[in-house]
Amino acid sequence: MAEFIFRHLATEMGLDDEFEISSAAVSYEEEGNGIYPYAADTLLRHSIPFGRHRAHRITRQEYDDADLVIVMDSSNMRLIRRITGDCSKVHKLLEYTVMEQDEVAGYQTVTNPDEVPDVADPWYTGNFEQAYSDIFRGCRALLYALLKSRKSHHC
């Protein structure tokens, strides 16, 4: 869902050409499968467009080519480290919501990734609405952080 939500938010802001967005799994369990039907239903309810999608496990090349790798939870982070031997560009999605709250409060903290909440996993809870809410908040905060970072790097 995160790929489609982020893409939708970027498109709404006229920034769809600014980012290369893709998603990959950390296991082979869903290899080749399309978007999970309950996830598709949730995206439709929120008017988030999505196209064809086939699950695949992240490759070392994809990791190397990425500027940023966003994961949903601590387990994903550990598995990325196991697959790639690195996690220097890996961040939990909800890390950006914590940073946003800290900025509003007037201070910036360095947060231990283990202290950042995980996105509610609908695979175990069946609650796709909660996952959507977490992912939407995280994607919005991530987009804000990327735009802010881009502005600070221009003269």
Residue spans of the language-model regions?
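Conserved active-site segments centered on acidic
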Residues: M1-A66, A145-C155
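Phosphate-binding/catalytic loops
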Residues: S74-C155
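Solvent-exposed, flexible loop/coil residues
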Residues: E30, A39, E62, D67, ...
